[in-house]
């Protein structure tokens, strides 16, 4: 598993030399700019809602102060009211002040849930906008190269983690930021009240004490976030191991291979690798700095309280001022603690937003080094002549080995071309280049002489129906799974059924509880799952649906890997009819498949080493003939363990073993 690298940590934290100027710059980068990003997010919540919540939070900040003032005046009026009796003016004043205090208290209780409900609406709006942005960023690249970049994966993981756990999201941070309006409005009002009621120096002293407490809390969280950045890679491992053990994907192997204990130990080890850095940082982050800041703050706050008591003892302030001073200082000190509605969510959101910003920058950096996507329309009927790989070379990003080395290959229009070779020969890479999932390192892929990089990628891909061996099993209905082959056109049920019939899966699908509308997942009510071979036919039907919608190229990458030999033979007996007039590329390790192709190409070491018809290549006695004979011998002895009934393959395949022996004479 990949762990965080030094480059993943905030640069200033790792490299900044001591000095006020650098420290100030680092603080701005770490604490100020991320908060400004959160402030800018407020616009996606709606101006009216944000303004209303701001006013509401100002009110929620002032109402507790009004309650403190009212109750303090109430305490001061009690002696006069008691002396005057219930019919006195002093008693009337006492009653009026009590009603004011009660009103302030009741308004606080009424407005708080209103603020919470509106805050949730703001959170949903902001988080929804950011989810859309993150999704748009990951869908933006034309190819899949950026999606395999380790730095991009780290930033994406950090960006979406808050959304996955649904707390500490940027939307919650926006709500928490507005909540700080209430907190700091209250603090400012209390500083003024203490200054007026007790002494002007006491107000700023209490305010400074509260800010010191707050700096200790927020400073610790900010330093903790640096540690969090260092363990992002390990966090991904923890998440992965948790998913493996909590879903049914690996349930069979976990039990059959006895992996329960091993997975539990691995999970604990990964989790400890995440937690240990925090434990090591705890004393440095909290113990000494927090004790120092708390001590200074308590001295300031305690000094204000003692000064208030001295003034009351010497008669310089009355009972009202004493009550007001004590209550105001106590309420102000309570503002120096941890803010659950703001602190954690804001810190996590700053991590997410910083990761999102780095994700944008990394994608921009990767795309800047790539050729801009073409915009030309794909001519109708393309390819009319041929698809050509013209001296194509390719190396995967970050890899040292060349996968394709000057490939010269022609796929004649309307014909079936097969590509064979050992694992790692570059067969699937050809498919990725043809689908523009990658761009060639050198050379070009051409359709009727035109570089396909000049075409609009989306238009070009509509011309290509692809079946990958590792196709996706979507948790959708059977009809939707097939119709995804041409998602750009309205779903045509008749065409869906026809594609299913051609792929040999229609009968099985129609027998499901809801037919084509049955969800292909047991996670949904009335849903079911299919066998591997049935899913393979769904994938084939998906590609055939694309052909029905106008695709001109069919690419089959190990198309029958999950079918038994007889089913494979039956499928390829129909293959020529299904793909008549279609330019097709067939990749398979089974020679019983490729022998039916019009043209066969042998790849080895990233180069084309042989090409021709099946009969011609067998007669040549070269690389293809040797591999064919080796596989035929395994078929004849029933040694190909991945096929059902493989001992009878010679019958199903029309005497493949006999033909191989004949070709080797």
Which positions does each model-derived feature cover?
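Extended non-transmembrane interhelical loops and adjacent amphipathic helices
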Residues: 2-36, 124-171, 234-243, 247-277, ...
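ABC ATPase nucleotide-binding domain helical subdomain, centered on the C-loop/LSGGQ "ABC signature"
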Residues: 446, 479-525, 581, 619
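ABC-fold ATPase nucleotide-binding domain signature/coupling loops
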Residues: 506-538, 542-559, 563, 638-639
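Transmembrane helix-loop-helix hairpins at lipid-water interfaces of multipass membrane proteins
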Residues: 51-111, 184, 188, 195-221, ...
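An intracellular "coupling" helix at the cytosolic face of ABC transporter transmembrane type-1 domains
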Residues: 43-44, 160-173, 233, 255-299, ...
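Cytosolic ends of transmembrane helices, especially the final helix of ABC transmembrane type-1 domains
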Residues: 325-362
């Amino acid at each position: 598993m990949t762990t965080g690298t030094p480059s993943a940590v905030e640069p200033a934290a790792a490299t900044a030399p001591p000095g006020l100027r650098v420290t100030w710059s680092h603080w701005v980068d770490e604490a100020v700019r991320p908060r400004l990003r959160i402030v800018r997010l407020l616009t996606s919540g709606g101006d009216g809602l944000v303004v209303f919540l701001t006013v509401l939070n100002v009110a929620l900040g002032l109402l507790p102060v009004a309650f403190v003032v009212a109750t303090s005046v109430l305490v001061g009026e009690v002696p006069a009211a008691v002396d005057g009796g219930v019919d006195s003016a002093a008693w009337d004043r006492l009653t009026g002040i009590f009603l004011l205090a009660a009103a302030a208290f009741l308004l606080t209780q009424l407005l708080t849930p209103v603020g919470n409900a509106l805050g949730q609406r703001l959170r949903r709006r902001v988080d929804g906008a950011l989810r859309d942005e993150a999704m748009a960023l990951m869908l933006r690249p034309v190819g899949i190269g950026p999606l395999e970049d380790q730095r991009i994966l780290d930033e994406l993981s950090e960006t979406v983690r808050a959304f996955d756990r649904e707390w500490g999201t940027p939307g919650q941070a926006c709500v928490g930021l507005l909540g700080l309006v209430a907190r700091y409005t209250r603090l400012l009002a209390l500083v003024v009240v203490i200054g007026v009621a007790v002494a002007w120096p006491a107000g700023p002293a209490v305010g400074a004490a509260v800010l010191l407490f707050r700096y200790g809390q927020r400073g610790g969280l900010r330093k903790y976030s640096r540690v969090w950045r260092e363990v992002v890679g390990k966090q991904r491992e923890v998440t992965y191991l948790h998913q493996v053990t909590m879903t049914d994907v690996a349930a069979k192997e976990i039990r059959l291979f006895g992996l329960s204990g091993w997975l539990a130990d691995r999970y604990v080890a990964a989790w400890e690798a995440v937690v240990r850095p925090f434990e090591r940082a705890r004393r440095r982050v909290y113990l000494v700095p927090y004790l120092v800041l708390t001590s200074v703050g308590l001295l300031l706050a305690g000094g204000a309280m003692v000064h208030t008591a001295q003034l009351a003892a010497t008669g310089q302030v009355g009972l009202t001022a004493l009550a007001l001073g004590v209550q105001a200082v106590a309420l102000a000190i309570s503002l120096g603690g941890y803010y659950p509605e703001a602190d954690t969510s804001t810190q996590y959101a700053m991590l997410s937003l910083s990761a999102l910003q780095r994700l944008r920058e990394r994608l921009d950096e990767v795309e800047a080094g790539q050729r801009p996507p073409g915009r030309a329309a794909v001519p109708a009927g393309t390819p009319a002549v041929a698809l050509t790989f013209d001296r194509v070379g390719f190396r995967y990003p970050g890899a040292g080995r060349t996968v394709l080395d000057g490939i010269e290959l022609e796929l004649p229009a309307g014909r079936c071309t097969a590509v064979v070779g050992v694992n790692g020969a570059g067969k699937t890479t050809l498919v990725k280049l043809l689908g523009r999932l990658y761009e060639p390192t050198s050379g070009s892929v051409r359709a009727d002489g035109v570089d396909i990089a000049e075409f609009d990628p989306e238009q070009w891909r509509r011309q290509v129906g692809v079946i990958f061996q590792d196709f996706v099993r979507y948790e959708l209905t059977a009809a939707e799974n097939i119709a995804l082959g041409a998602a750009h056109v309205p779903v045509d049920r008749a065409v869906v059924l026809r594609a299913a019939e051609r792929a040999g899966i229609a009968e099985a699908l129609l027998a499901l509880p809801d037919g084509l509308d049955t969800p292909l997942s047991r996670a949904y009510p009335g849903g079911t799952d299919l066998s591997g071979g049935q899913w393979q036919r769904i994938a084939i039907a998906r590609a055939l649906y694309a052909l029905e919608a106008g695709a001109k190229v069919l690419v089959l990458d190990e198309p029958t890997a999950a079918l038994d030999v007889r089913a494979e033979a039956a499928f390829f007996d129909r293959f020529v009819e299904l793909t008549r007039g279609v330019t097709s590329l067939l990749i398979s390790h089974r020679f019983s498949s490729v022998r039916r192709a019009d043209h066969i190409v042998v790849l080895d070491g990233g180069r084309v080493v042989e090409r021709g018809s099946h009969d011609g290549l067998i007669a040549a006695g070269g690389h293809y003939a040797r591999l064919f004979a080796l596989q035929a011998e395994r078929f004849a002895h029933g040694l190909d363990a991945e096929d059902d009934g493989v001992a009878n393959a010679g019958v199903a395949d029309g005497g493949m073993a006999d033909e191989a022996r004949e070709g080797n004479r």
